[in-house]
Each structure stands twice: as structure tokens, then as C-alpha cells.
Amino acid sequence: MRADKSLSPFEIRVYRHYRIVHGTRVALAFLLTFLIIRLFTIPESTWPLVTMVVIMGPISFWGNVVPRAFERIGGTVLGSILGLIALQLELISLPLMLVWCAAAMFLCGWLALGKKPYQGLLIGVTLAIVVGSPTGEIDTALWRSGDVILGSLLAMLFTGIWPQRAFIHWRIQLAKSLTEYNRVYQSAFSPNLLERPRLESHLQKLLTDAVKMRGLIAPASKETRIPKSIYEGIQTINRNLVCMLELQINAYWATRPSHFVLLNAQKLRDTQHMMQQILLSLVHALYEGNPQPVFANTEKLNDAVEELRQLLNNHHDLKVVETPIYGYVWLNMETAHQLELLSNLICRALRK
């Protein structure tokens, strides 16, 4: 897929309600599978439906479909073979059949806690379905094996129809996170406030949303072939910005005299507006897919430091504590640097 593809309003609306879309797809797949079973009068018709729901339910993004498809189909076929062997062993010796099933379920549990949990799950489910056939009825067992494989193939087919892209979902979530960050930033440092705003819940939500985005990195990297290190770098910077914002708020509202000094620093306010514009441009780039490198103007921040020194000299009679002031300015400089790095990484992620 093209990483720089512009997102239409319809796509944005659909991906913001991706759980509803996925639920609708599962429901339609269930109904179509049911009609296929009834139309062709397939014996043991319960098992294609069960298999389709078990396989299709957890799959949500296209980057997960292909690798998990092979895992699921491989688990289904292996489970069917193990089940058929178990039924043959039952005709020879029941204890031998039980030992065989125990070994197969051990394999199921061992894989379920490894890198291929769905394959282990399907081995166990398919084995249970096949060995549940009446003793000696190999035809029933074969039909059940075929039904499970049919359900797996139908699940893969329906999942591949208009699949959701983890990369697009990642872009929307990152744009949403930066937009919310910008709102909190404006609320915290608004010159119209007399008291410190209560933003703890908003900061916690920003941090929680940033952590949730980590689950999109692996499938998005598979879809776009963009190295995971770029996504990881963006993830780290996004989290760092939230943490630094909390420290900035603490320094900005540390004491009343220092707050007034910061409030009267014109170049510092200009710098704040500059960073807000950077955030808006990054959000626009994520939606439009046409990024332009944004370089933070650190010279303005250096001018702000000089202006603050002059303000401190003019207010020497007010017992102003310099630590929160220079701490706030340094955090602004570091935030600008992080935004510059974030801009470069987003440009690399949205390359043509």
C-alpha cells in the first residue's frame, strides 16, 4: 500500500469506528457461511460456523491476516490429522489413544504460550471436534475435519474483503493524539487563566492512548515494509512529549512570581505559538499524507532565555525563584527538539 495516500473523510469515519465495522463483517460472514451450508446441505454443518467465528473474531487488521491465516490453517490441518490418528488408535487401544490425545493437547498448550498462540488453539479445537465423533465412524470424523478446514478458508476469504489497514489506523490515532496534546498544551499555558487548571486526567489519557498505539506497530510495519524502528521512535517521542508536558505545567505554575515572569515573556509566548503550529502541521500531514519537514526554531527559544534574564533583573525585588523559570524554558527547548525529531520520523513513515 502507498504510505503517502491521503485519507478521505469517509475512511477517517470508518476507521474511527473500526470495531463496529469488524463486528458487521463477522455478522455478515456468519450469515453467508450459514446460507452456503444450507444450500449445499453439508453434513456436520455446525463446525464450519464455529471455526469461522473462532478464526475470524480476533483478526482485525490486514497486516495480521496473512501470517495468522497460515497459522490457523496449519493448526487446523494438523489438528485434523492428529484427531484422525486418535480415532484409529481408539480401535486398537483406548489407553494408547488417551496418551496420544494428551500429547497432542500438550503441544496445543505449549504453542498457545509461544509465538504462535492461534496455531496452538486451532490444533486443540480441531482435535476436540474430530475425536468427538462416535467410535469407529471415520466418515463423520473426515466430514468434521473438512468442515473445519472449510470454515478456516471462508474466514480468511471474508477477512480479506475490504480489510482494515493497521497503518491507516495508526496514522489516525497518532493525529488524534497530537491534536489532543495540542489542546492540553493550549489549556495549560493560556494567558487567560488565573489558577492552575486540573489536567491530570487528560494527561493520563494521553499517556494511555500512546501506550495503546504500540499494538499497531507490528501489523503496520508488515503492511508498509517500513522498519519497526521508525514506529518505535515515533512511539517513544510521543510518550516523551506527554511526560515533558506534565513537567512544563509544574514549572509554569510553580510559584506566583515566576508565573508572572513567564507570562510577560513575549518571545516565549511566540515560541509556544510556533510549537502549536508545528503540531497542527504534523496532524495535517498525517491526514493528507504529504509531509513537509518541520524544523523547530531554537533561536527563538534562545532569545526567550535572554529575555527572561532581563525580566529577572527588572524584578529583582520580587523574590522570584529562578529554577522553575529556567526549567520551563529548558523543557520548551527540549520539546521543540523532540517535535523536530518527530517531524523527521513522520516524513520517513509517509515516504512515497
Curated annotation (Swiss-Prot):
Name assigned to this protein: Inner membrane protein YeeA
UniProt keywords, alphabetically: Cell inner membrane, Cell membrane, Membrane, Transmembrane, Transmembrane helix
Compartments, as annotated in UniProt: Cell inner membrane
Record field: transmembrane: 26-46, 47-67, 69-89, 91-111, 118-138, 148-168
Topology feature Cytoplasmic, residues: 1-25, 68, 112-117, 169-352
UniProt-listed Pfam families: FUSC
Molecular function (Gene Ontology), one example: transmembrane transporter activity
Segments on the Periplasmic face: 90, 139-147
Annotated signal peptide: none
Chief place of localization: membrane
Membrane topology: Multi-pass membrane protein
Cellular component annotations (GO), alphabetically ordered: plasma membrane
